Amino acid sequence: MATLPAAETWIDGGGGVGADAVNLTASLAAGAATGAVETGWLQLLDQAGNLSSSPSALGLPVASPAPSQPWANLTNQFVQPSWRIALWSLAYGVVVAVAVLGNLIVIWIILAHKRMRTVTNYFLVNLAFSDASMAAFNTLVNFIYALHSEWYFGANYCRFQNFFPITAVFASIYSMTAIAVDRYMAIIDPLKPRLSATATKIVIGSIWILAFLLAFPQCLYSKTKVMPGRTLCFVQWPEGPKQHFTYHIIVIILVYCFPLLIMGITYTIVGITLWGGEIPGDTCDKYHEQLKAKRKVVKMMIIVVMTFAICWLPYHIYFILTAIYQQLNRWKYIQQVYLASFWLAMSSTMYNPIIYCCLNKRFRAGFKRAFRWCPFIKVSSYDELELKTTRFHPNRQSSMYTVTRMESMTVVFDPNDADTTRSSRKKRATPRDPSFNGCSRRNSKSASATSSFISSPYTSVDEYS
């Protein structure tokens, strides 16, 4: 995700070109999340020409200096005022600090407490790791490159910078997709076996392998070029800017549109089932507790997905618009638009821990324990128990043995035996309604079909809350 989005002016030592130079803007590498400058930069840097447009990484116009000006006399002057740099630095610094710390705490809460080790939470660990890595290894480095248009971090990190962000975003969004599919299966067809810990790890490993394959071209074609006075990091595509544009569109489809479509469908079906399928007349505490817990988890994950979609949408729109309408790249505020859209995209890495803390009592208890050293944070005994106690409910089959004999069978006398000794009677036990689970219902038979999504054998409430 190396970029070159800084507003800068090519100025020759004597000032002849400066008056006619064009600001190089954020859009020169709007692929901050997917790659940076390539063929166009080589054209810009290796050939002399009048102040004219050459295609950049995304097919955007960049300014070439006049032929009379030697490269040695060209300087890269950053034109943003210091107060604006300070504000952007503070904004990006907050994202990095909150994202790294918050996601590391989420990982600790899940892995350090046995009660939290559920299928959904294993995917949340993968999501937290992806977000923390993105914030730690990409956000600040990319921001520095965007501000100064100079690569300070070497050729190897240039490859990593162009390669890893796509990998991390892919892992994040498909971890959310895996959670959506798992919630769908658990609620719509609860009698099917759930993913085991081993199967969950295989799914997570497969997500990362696919992410590496998608991002590999960015690593393969990454290059650095040392120019007089500065170094650039870019992706040089063999077939030029059009190939990069095609690749970026493919990335948008695979890491944004397609997974959001899948999650939209699954959560819509799950939402209709949970909020529209309550059984009339059911007063069982177990039923209502599981229903409430499932609703909370689904609501939390819907908010997580919507946050991701909203944060990344302006960035993708920015790239598409600046690629199609190239004159936008000469707008004097385009760098600020880029920095704002990139900040919003990167800020998606810091919201999830906040959402978990606000909407899930066990994560909230975990965050309290993590910050118990703060004088204004009080950890109650209830918070301690939240991360230690596991509550299991019996399944429908086991609950039938807890009711009385009178409730579980009906004795029927055979009239053909009336002439025999009165003490000799044949008893036939009529099986009880298998939908009965100890809850009082007005019509258990009519409710049995609807209740299948609520209870599965030996289900822990921890799976849903």
Curated annotation (Swiss-Prot):
Disulfide pairings: C158-C233
Pfam families (UniProt xref): 7tm_1 (PF00001)
* Record's keyword annotation contains Plastid: no
SUPFAM superfamilies for this protein: Family A G protein-coupled receptor-like
Start and end residues of each stretch annotated as Disordered: 415-465
Tell me which residues are glycosylated. N23, N50, N73
- Kindly report every residue range on the membrane side named Cytoplasmic: 108-117, 182-201, 271-299, 360-465
Location in the cell reads: Cell membrane
**What keywords would UniProt list here?**
Cell membrane, Disease variant, Disulfide bond, G-protein coupled receptor, Glycoprotein, Hypogonadotropic hypogonadism, Lipoprotein, Membrane, Palmitate, Receptor, Transducer, Transmembrane, Transmembrane helix
Which residue ranges have biased composition labelled Low complexity?
445-465
List where the protein spans the membrane.
Answer: 85-107, 118-139, 160-181, 202-222, 246-270, 300-321, 335-359
Q: How does it sit in the membrane?
A: Multi-pass membrane protein
Source domain of life is Eukaryota
Q: Which disease is it linked to?
A: Hypogonadotropic hypogonadism 11 with or without anosmia: A disorder characterized by absent or incomplete sexual maturation by the age of 18 years, in conjunction with low levels of circulating gonadotropins and testosterone and no other abnormalities of the hypothalamic-pituitary axis. In some cases, it is associated with non-reproductive phenotypes, such as anosmia, cleft palate, and sensorineural hearing loss. Anosmia or hyposmia is related to the absence or hypoplasia of the olfactory bulbs and tracts.
The text of the family note is: Belongs to the G-protein coupled receptor 1 family.
Main function: This is a receptor for the tachykinin neuropeptide neuromedin-K (neurokinin B). It is associated with G proteins that activate a phosphatidylinositol-calcium second messenger system. The rank order of affinity of this receptor to tachykinins is: neuromedin-K > substance K > substance P.
Official protein name in the record = Neuromedin-K receptor
| Species assigned in the record | Homo sapiens (Human)
> Which gene specifies this protein's sequence?
TACR3
